[in-house]
Amino acid sequence: MNIRGAPDLGQPSDDPNSGGERERIRQRMKMVIGQLEGILRELKEVAKELREVVSQIDKLTSDFDFELEPDDWTTATVSSTSSSDKAGAGGPFDLGHLDFMTADILSDSWEFCSFLDVSTPSDSVDGPEAPRPGTGPDYQLMNGGLPIPNGPRVETPDSSSEEAFSAGPAKGQVPQRTPGTRERVRFSDKVLYHALCCDDEEGDGEEVEEEEAGLAPELPRVEPHTGPLKPSPAPYKTKRSPLTTRRLGPTLAPEQTRRVTRNSSTQTVSDKSTQTVLPYTATKQKAKGKN
């Protein structure tokens, strides 16, 4: 059926079925409206509770004095009244007239700008002025340097030098150093060599050759006891690789073994492991004992 009650030609007319569907739709709409009304009532109750909480907060904080300095950058500087008084005056968002160009607010910024003008060099035609004693701030350098007026224009000592780790000089002694110069590193060549080069076999070979050359004139003094015709082996040991000299370490003289197996804190781990005399005799004795 259509709106006027006439039967619809396209659909068969069922009066009881169509009336039941309308009733069901009306009931659902009433149920939804009732739920919405209940939600509105609950929201009104929540609003009342919030108003009571706000009034209690106002009563508790009425004894507090919230007046702040005028140069504080907060919205609380406008007024120290409660939220209810603000709502009655001009709405909850009425902050009044904020004048940010007052002298009290800009006092700190102008002082900072004047400090920058004093600390920076002038851009005059005559050139930068010489630093006057007592006027510019003294900047303490970071690597143990001395207080130098008007910024770090003198280079600091190198962090690897001994000057950076040594104690500061006396108050009366001020080192005269020109800009651009650096302190010479006081590390010895041997320490610097072992720190930069982990493979120091060439230096060991030269030291062993120097030791053999130094001990060469002492060997003929011992030779007359063995025989006059036996040639001295000193000239044949002058040219020898570092590996062979290390393998023949147990057969060297006690003075040579002391010099070869020197104890130095600057040697690398590989250098010490190759220069120490390994206990080959102990393993041979164990093998003989087992046989």
Swiss-Prot record:
Disulfide bonds: none annotated. Residues 1-25, 120-186, 201-291 are annotated as: Disordered. Keywords: Coiled coil, Synapse. It is found in: Postsynaptic density. GO terms for cellular component: GABA-ergic synapse; postsynaptic density; postsynaptic specialization. One of its GO terms (biological process) is postsynaptic specialization organization. Belongs to the INSYN1 family. This is Inhibitory synaptic factor 1. The gene is Insyn1.
